Amino acid sequence: MASKISKAKSNREAIWPGGVPKPAMPYSPAIKAGPWVFIAGQLASDFGPDGLAMECRDHPDLPFQSIPQRRQSAYILQNIKDTCAAAGASLDDDSVRIWQWFTAPNQNRDGGTWVGDGFTITPYLEERDRFLTHDRPASTGMGIKNLLVKDTIVEVDVLLNTETKKQQVALDVPQALAGYSQGLITGDWVFTAGEHATDFVGDTGRADYNGPRSAIQLDARTPSELLWYGLPVKLQTQKLFDKLERNLETCGSSMKDVVHATIYYSHPKNLAEIEEAWIERFPVDPPARTMIPYMGIGIRGCDPEIALVALKKGGKTKKQTIMADGVGAPIGHEPHAVKAGDLLFFSTQIAGDTNGLCAGGKRAEEYPWYGLPARAQMNFILENVAKVCEAAGTSIENICRRQAFHTDFDWFMESIDEWARHFPKDPPCSTTLEIGGPLHLDGALFLLDLIGYCPDE
């Protein structure tokens, strides 16, 4: 039976800061909803005719005088800082979660996650450290295929909480090298950074090693590739959950208190191994979950990366699993969504269910130029989203943030046009990325990661 919660009046508003480039597509630069501020993906464009912002361009006769990633990162982070201020928030003091997306043209997209030898994000990190000086937000940084504006190579989006002070938690696990918070608490909320099955040493300095050189911790490795044994992605996922469980306990939470997991992984052909480890850890009443393939991970050999949102034990904020009438069964062991306090976390939104792809979501072979499949897929998803929102006591107008992962940007314009039809006023903030394909649902052109707002009754 579907759960249903009564509706309450919303205090969600779009933020349009002065002095920051206005998006060229139908989304808001930021959404403020109660204590939460969602910042749309920012990239180094002023959305003018030249695409890349003038501040990020070298003189055409001096193309080697600066590091493009540094210039673009500084431009992006300043715009984010200004957008936060327009929403009454501080990027440094209030940010609790940050996502960073880097174009990685040499990334292995055929079952691995390595972004290619020589790839670095150090210029970005050095710029980030000028803007984020303490209790840095829990972080994810991923290699992706492409961004929407030519020559842009970095995109960043952020979540902030203006109500309660954030605090970085010292965790008894191998320490990340990039200087972010692996565990962060704010009020009743716990955010973990994207974690991996690594000790941040791996084969560095080792004369003997098992299999290809990697940064995977030794107990998360399967036997030598010369033997017929082992499920390498499943084993990494199991060891990763062990680490996350310890992290949550240190933060005053537990795996039972997880409300949403984001799983960044290599390729849909490895999904089944992750799913087996997931079911072992969450046999009943699992949290909401978004699974995103073709991710470039900056720790060689690691697959997957998992980040969690959880609640502190014994806090006032409670969670509730949402299953909506009229919405097909999720693909995999996950609910439609989980409501936690005033936020609604959706599981992977994709244009189908256990019965396959939605009607109209693929052109017939006999009529290869007939139909608008991206429009049909987006409409299918958003009709489901509206039903899930209704079951949670809110409405689709209270969606605050989307991350959209496209197989091919050729379908972007058709899909965003349909998206805009469902949000005629104050559309959610948005981050849109090209990752490649195919996805785990044959014929699907994109997947969405959504967060909604459920105002207090």
Model-inferred region functions:
Residues 1-97, 102-242, 246-260, 265-383, ...:
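N-terminal presequence-like segments and the immediate start of the first folded domain
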